[in-house]
Curated annotation (Swiss-Prot):
Family membership noted in the UniProt record: Belongs to the class-II aminoacyl-tRNA synthetase family. Type 1 subfamily.
Gene this chain is encoded by: aspS
Catalytic activity, reaction form: tRNA(Asx) + L-aspartate + ATP = L-aspartyl-tRNA(Asx) + AMP + diphosphate
Highest taxon in the source lineage: Bacteria
Protein name according to UniProt: Aspartate--tRNA(Asp/Asn) ligase
This protein's GO CC annotations: cytoplasm
Coiled-coil regions listed in the entry: none
Compartments it resides in: Cytoplasm
Enzyme Commission (EC) number: 6.1.1.23
PANTHER family on file: ASPARTATE--TRNA LIGASE, MITOCHONDRIAL, ASPARTYL/LYSYL-TRNA SYNTHETASE
GO biological process: aspartyl-tRNA aminoacylation
Annotated site residue numbers, Important for tRNA non-discrimination: 33, 83
Lineage of the organism: Bacteria, Pseudomonadati, Pseudomonadota, Alphaproteobacteria, Hyphomicrobiales
Length: 591
């Protein structure tokens, strides 16, 4: 017999009855029923009920056991007594009568229980992550993550892609976030950087004659805490292809992502034939570039119905050309209580309020706005929005660039409050035609809005003749249920166009050469047209596991202060290590 086990804790069935077996695992739960001890023994594969009564030679040893002790149990498989089967367990028809117990690893008092799914403070869970990972839901999420990554790999290879690994130590480059820097011992005063993404390397692969690259790539960004991204590192399905158009990339990747979602959707519907939504349309209809299409609400510009109207607040605003009035339909929201609740919510978001119109039976509009603009305009708004009696509409006004984010939040709030969001689907879409540049209010300059290596629509001519803020790029995102899960673009593969694109964003040619020397040189020796994308593995897994917390699908995540509480990182290092790296610390005054 094997030293530790003949079977796993998830293996025993009716066919094993009367066999002598050996199991090893953790004491998940111990129950005393009238002097009979029931030990639920757990391992990675499942759970088996083991029984020790006073007649068992191992009864005295069983009495000493405590939760999460690691033990070896020998015993005989038998049928559970009639009426005590557990249909929720694969092993639920049988139990093991214990004849011998060996304690392999006793456990101290637990800082958090493994049995059950009760909530515990996050710092405790992260500090004792090895215990947290034993809990059923989190353990299953990690296994699902592995299966999803396997599915991605399989589907990418079926599409003709090849998996390569790119370097982890590289050069620092301006890709939108701070780099994690690694000092060089051999080259004093110089630093490597951990890659924010394999962007330059995957483009260099295309210039090296490879095609259809992918990898599950770790990425590192020294960013301030964000709710939708873990501090430190994350993983992406990184992709690049040569001699392709935007449509070619869509045709290659849509089946991969759709297939992964269908495989792990657990009965939810998955969009087939994804819609393509222009960035400008997405912002106008949904108030965001990552729309949740499970929500059927589409906002509309209804400025004409308020221009010159009796509602002077909006009418005066509309005298300025940049201002608009947008309507947010609220099907079924035509009650005073709901409209007042939305108005209070808007005030809680720092807004002056949220104007509204309700439609009564017979189509009559009600509310302060309806009273001020009159029945004809009210009816025209109702018809434009496709609303009926019992519905409402909410209004935001001003400069769309300033209110669009709030309008998107209001659309989401209305959809949630009126139960309009279809929770039984994964609604996938492409968002296309992103602006190449945006105006950075902090730095008072034009900056890249997305990936700086993307091809502008119109090429070099657009860069030299158009207002930079009107240039669109061959950039695209994949969105799902309100999350951006992938981003990509066709690359700017001509060196003169690359230099011009960076020049508009404030980078001189020499700075481009210094920062992107390897890629700049490669462009001089025959660069193919190429493009690609990167899909966020963590976010996809999060969606498919049905959680909204990235820590629930990650093995050993940091907390929001970028600390690994389990390993004690970041940590101080010895003076000797600092001397070897030629580093002297200049710490801020913490007094």
């Amino acid at each position: 017999m094997h030293r530790y086990r003949t079977h796993t804790c998830g293996a025993l069935r009716d066919s094993h009855i009367d066999q002598t077996v050996r199991l090893s695992g953790w004491c998940h739960r111990i129950r005393d029923h009238g002097g009979v001890l029931f030990i639920d023994l757990r391992d990675h594969y499942g759970l088996t009920q083991c029984v020790a009564d006073p007649d068992s030679p191992a009864f005295k040893d069983a009495e000493k056991l405590r939760a999460e002790w690691v033990v070896r149990i020998d015993g005989k498989v038998r049928r559970r007594p009639e009426g005590t089967d557990n249909p929720d367990l694969p092993t639920g028809a049988v139990e093991v009568f214990v004849t011998e117990i060996e304690v392999l690893g006793p456990a101290g008092e637990l800082p958090l229980p493994v049995f059950g799914e009760q909530e515990y403070p996050e710092d405790v869970r992260l500090r004792y992550r090895f215990l947290d990972l034993r809990r059923e839901k989190l353990h299953q999420n990690i296994m699902t993550r592995g299966a999803i990554v396997d599915s991605m790999r399989r589907r990418m290879k079926e599409q003709g892609f090849f998996e390569f690994q790119t370097p982890i130590l590289t050069a620092s480059s301006p890709e939108g976030a701070r780099d994690f820097l690694v000092p060089s011992r051999i080259h004093p005063g110089k630093f490597y950087a951990l890659p924010q993404a394999p962007q330059q390397y995957k483009q260099l692969l295309m210039m090296s004659g490879f095609d259809r690259y992918f990898q599950i790539a770790p990425c590192f960004r020294d960013e301030d805490p964000r709710a939708d991204r873990l501090p430190g590192e994350f993983y992406q399905l990184d992709v690049e292809m040569s001699f392709v158009t935007q449509d070619d990339i869509f045709a290659a990747m849509e089946p991969v992502i759709t297939g992964v979602f269908e495989e792990f959707a657990k009965g939810k519907r998955v969009t087939k034939g994804w819609p393509r939504i222009a960035f400008a349309d997405s912002m106008r209809k949904y108030g965001t570039d990552k729309p949740d299409l499970r929500n059927p609400i589409e906002m509309q510009d209804v400025s004409e119905h308020f221009r010159g109207s009796g509602f002077k607040v909006f009418a005066r605003m509309l005298e300025e050309q940049r201002n608009q009035v947008w309507a947010i339909p609220g099907p079924g929201g035509g009650s005073r209580a709901f409209c007042d609740r939305m108005n209070s919510w808007a005030q809680g978001e720092g807004q002056p309020g949220l104007g509204y119109i309700m439609w009564r039976e017979g189509g009559e509009g009600a509310g302060p706005l309806a009273n001020n603009i009159g029945p004809e305009r009210t009816e025209a708004i109702r018809a434009a929005l496709g609303l009926k009696a019992g519905d409402a509409a909410f209004f935001v006004a001003g400069d769309p660039s300033k209110f669009v984010k709030f309008a998107g939040l209001a659309r989401t709030k209305v959809g949630e409050e009126l139960n309009l969001i279809d929770k039984d689907q994964f609604a996938l879409a492409w968002v296309v035609d992103f602006p190449m540049y945006e105006y950075n209010e902090d730095d008072k300059k034009v900056d890249f809005s997305h990936n700086p290596f993307s091809m502008p629509q119109g090429g070099m001519e657009a860069l030299t003749s158009q207002d930079p803020l009107t240039i669109k790029a061959f950039q695209y995102d994949i969105t799902c249920n309100g999350y951006e899960i992938a981003s990509g673009g066709i690359r700017n593969h001509r060196p003169e166009a690359m230099v011009k694109a960076f020049e508009i964003a404030g980078y001189g040619e020499q700075e481009v050469v210094d920062r992107f020397g390897g890629m700049y040189r490669a462009f001089q020796y025959g660069a193919p047209p190429h493009g690609g994308m990167a899909a966020g593995v963590d976010r996809i897994v999060m969606l498919l596991c049905g959680t909204t917390n990235l820590r629930e699908i990650s093995l050993f995540p940091m907390n929001q202060r970028a600390e690994d509480l389990l390993m004690g990182a970041p940590s101080e290092v010895s003076p000797k290590q600092l001397r070897e790296l030629h580093i002297r610390l200049n710490l801020p005054d913490t007094k």
